[in-house]
Amino acid sequence: MCRPLSVVAVLGALAVTAPAAWAAAWSTVASPNPSGGQDVLNEVGRLRGTNVLYAVGRTNLGTLVLRSANRGASWQVESAPSPGTGTQLFGVSVRVGGVWAVGYLSGPSRTSTVTLRRKGGTWTRVPSPNPDFADQLYGVVTTPAGTWAVGTGTGTGGNSHPLILHWTGRAWKTQPAPALPKGNNQLFGIAGKGSDLWAFGQREKNGGTLHPLALHHTASGWHVSKTPDPARGGESFFFGGTISGGTVWAVGGRGSGSRHALAERHTASGWKAVTVPDGAGCTATNELTAVVPIPGTKHLLAVGDCSPGPGNRTLVERRRNGAWHQVSSPTPDATGSFLTGVVAFSQTRAAAVGYRTPAGFRTLALIYH
C-alpha cells in the first residue's frame, strides 16, 4: 500500500510502549542512497513464501528500486527504467509471476503515470493511460483476479478524482470510478484478497474538509463504502489498508492541527473506527501509513510517524488481543524519520522502510528480529 511524500508529516527521537511479548526488537539496518541527497523509500513488498523483498521510491535522478534476499537484513540497488528526474515510485506488488511498481513522472508541462514491471530479472516500463491533465499512481495490488493500480487524476480546473487502472494481461485500461462531489478526491492505497478488492484514500466535502474514502470492487464495479469520520469535520484520510481473514483494515490520520492516528475496520456490519494510541509524547502529528497481517496469527502491524513538535519519529503499532499498542522503534535522525511501508514474516520477524531527513533525504530501513 502507499502515500505521497507531501502529505506525510515531520520530527525527532525514540518511541515507547506496550510490554514486549516476544524477545525481538526493531533496529536500523544499512540501506543504499545512490544519489546521496534525495533518496526516499515509499513502499515494500514480499515475494510470498520467500525471504525476498522489493522496496521502491525515488532519488534525485528518478526511480529507486531496492531488493533484499534476506528479509531486509541487507539491501541492493536494482537497475530500473526512469523516464526522468521527476519520477517517483509509490506502490509495489510482488508475485511469483512478476513484480509491479507504480508512480508518476512530474514533467515540465504535465504529470503522468508510470508503471514498471520486473520479469525474468529485468525491469521494463509498461505504457499506462493518462486521461487527465495530471495523473498519479500511488498503489498497486496483484491477486488471482488480476492487477490493479490506483491514484488520482486532476483536470485543468484543479479538481481531483480517483484514478483506477486494471491490467488486462496485455495493457493497462482505465476503470470507471464512483462519482464524487467535486474537490480533492484521491486514492493512496489498494488491497486485495482473491476477487475482494478495496481502495483507500480521501474525499473532500462540506466546504473543503477531508474525510476517509474507501471504495469496494464487486461484480458490478467500484462503489463507495461508507466510513465513519472520527475527526467530525476535521481533516481525516486513509493512507492504506489490508485484508486479514474476513476483516478489512484501513489506517491513516485524523484531526486538523493536532492530528491523531486513525484505524478503522470493516466487517459484515460495516466500517467502525477503532481506538489506536498516538505515539508517546507525540502531541503534534500522528499518522499511520501502512498496515499488514502477521502470518500465523490474528495480529496486525502498522507503521508511520509522529511528532511532539519539531522533527518526526518513527511510529510502529501492533494489534494483538483485540487492542492496538505502540512498539518501541528507533529514530535515527531527530530532524525527521518516517516509515512508509512494512512486511511481516512472523511474530518475531518483520521489515519496514521509509526515509530520514538529516540534510536532504536518505533511505531508512528497519528490521524486527
Place the predicted regions along the sequence by residue.
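Residue-level hotspots at or immediately adjacent to binding/recognition sites across diverse folds
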Residues: 22-369
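Secretory targeting and sorting signals
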Residues: 1-24
